Amino acid sequence: MTEDQLEQETLTWLQDVGYTHRYGPDIAFDGSSPERADYRQVVLPFRLREAINRLNPGIPVAAREDAIKQVTDLGIPSLLSANRAFHKLLVGGVPVQYQKDGETRGDFVRLIDWAHPEKNEWWAINQFTIKGPHKTRRPDIILFVNGLPLVLLELKNPADENANIWKAFDQIETYKEQIPDVFQYNEVLVISDGTDALMGSL
């Protein structure tokens, strides 16, 4: 089995469990169905906005837009600190304030419907090009939930003795340095050679 075959097998399995497969070049800014403004953008803004609007109908539009801004611009230079801050927003909701009946009210905008998984949008995207500060990289598969890149999978050729899962681990470590923005939103990292697999976090 080649690395490409392993990637296709993985995508087939992901579709079997409910993910929608999208091909990275198709949803690029210059693709047939663009979902991002450029290769630097790691969140899919249209998907995120649609999900926030769908899951939070009782919160005013301006507050929902504020939540989107908070999520897409975490404003924290440290990767680990940004990742922790996003995790808090993902689990507990994004804090917002708005005026109602002459009073300032506080609420939380949900990014995911934890109680009803079927109400979320699950995408598995392969060959998703990301432009970092100095390098451009393309991880094998990224899993998006409501437009958020929560899981990154790096695969290696099971037939190549020199390309085991630890090579995939080294690749992810390189990605952290070269395309750090996508890791701000990461919840799970997966490495596999088709026989062995490991998962973890930052």
Summary of predicted features, one role per range:
Residues 1-202:
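An alpha-helical interface "stripe"
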